[in-house]
């Protein structure tokens, strides 16, 4: 059942006032999406829509990554963006967009109807931009700039036009009066199953990964013969995403991202997103009786044969083939993204009996076997090689992908680490007192212990019933100590407690002992 909160067209001030309360009203057990229908918007809880955590970009605090190249197409894109952002919609920027449309129409690579529609959408977006103020103007301005930057860089090709101009029109409709979304909110528009995500300062952005994850969820509901099966909606989603596929080179199509992220200049692609798309088209081909979906998927395989920044194939840190999360970041090795890329290629190879996809999987899977052990920090997982430890959501995502590799019987190592990482989520900490048993009065004495996982550790020292020492601190996995200076001789009771901080479950362990304190000499 959908949980719905309806919003009517309201003034900007009222919309902003309502945002914090009304848009937060839906439950969190399913993905949340704001559905736009004309001048109305509603937030729904939809089991097919991924949660924010499932499709989020790297966690806050992840190190920035360098762009894959500052020459060639990457440099052209960067210069075009700087020019597009340099002034308030100059005539040269507009002329570049018009010229791109006119060239495509003259060469009959787009229809006259598309030419007129997309030109009108662009003109209307610029007019709307001029009427807006503040943050709403900034969001729409960024999306207009994205179209102009493509045109200025001679990258507004006919295959990029559908996604670019539809995204522009979505933003033009949204920003004048609809409720201001929260960061990373997902938005869809009536009549379309495609998902956009709000990135502050960058407007509503087409998000291939969350859209293709939604497609896989819709397919799963149909395969399980659930009442919620929406085969028509799945067909609409995949048909629309087919029109948004970009001919990134003569060798392959891809689904691009159109915003700046962590040093990357658009348009860039994600191996994880494209592999999920390949998987989605392969799965739906038989269900929907659409064999041409297999050809769409096959056309996307070239990204995994092509080096960055055009494609996502690189050399992993263990020396084998690795598929990148971000085409602009050739040295960022994200464990969960790599596994999902492999799963998508494996599944399509099996479904379509496709030797090329199977070969791409087999070329890179040995690298994954070498990489996964280095994701383990002993009580949790890392997000990326030599990167930060994963937050709870990314640890669970990696565990799920490991379990998926295990159930597909792709290697015992994946089963081992899926079990291990599950243990890290549910096992209590193990706390062991390490000494000393004897010390001397007035001497600074370390109360030593070993703890098995990141925990808040508390030490209390009693003389009889009297508390004489108490300390609390956070310790990582391994050994730790509290410094205690006993004032006089006697027998003291030491009580230690540990509360793990990884899972939010607050699991605990305790240890106790006695220390004999001898008189100072």
Regions found by a protein language model. Give the residues of each.
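Low-complexity, Ser/Thr/Pro/Gly-enriched N-terminal "stalk/linker" regions
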Residues: 31-209, 220, 224-257, 375
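Well-ordered alpha-helical segments within folded domains of soluble proteins
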Residues: 141-151, 162-166, 205-222, 268-285, ...
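Long, well-ordered core segments of solenoidal/helical folds
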Residues: 169-201, 231-253, 291-316, 355-380, ...
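Carbohydrate-binding/catalytic loop surfaces
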Residues: 183-203, 251-269, 314-336, 376-401
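Short, compositionally biased P/S/T/A/G/V-rich stretches that sit at domain boundaries
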Residues: 201, 423-444, 512-521
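Short proline/glycine-enriched turn/loop motifs at strand-loop junctions of beta-rich domains
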Residues: 451-456
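Conserved aromatic beta-strand anchor motif in extracellular beta-sandwich/beta-rich domains
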Residues: 459-463
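Glycine-centered tight-turn motifs at strand-turn-strand junctions
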Residues: 468-490
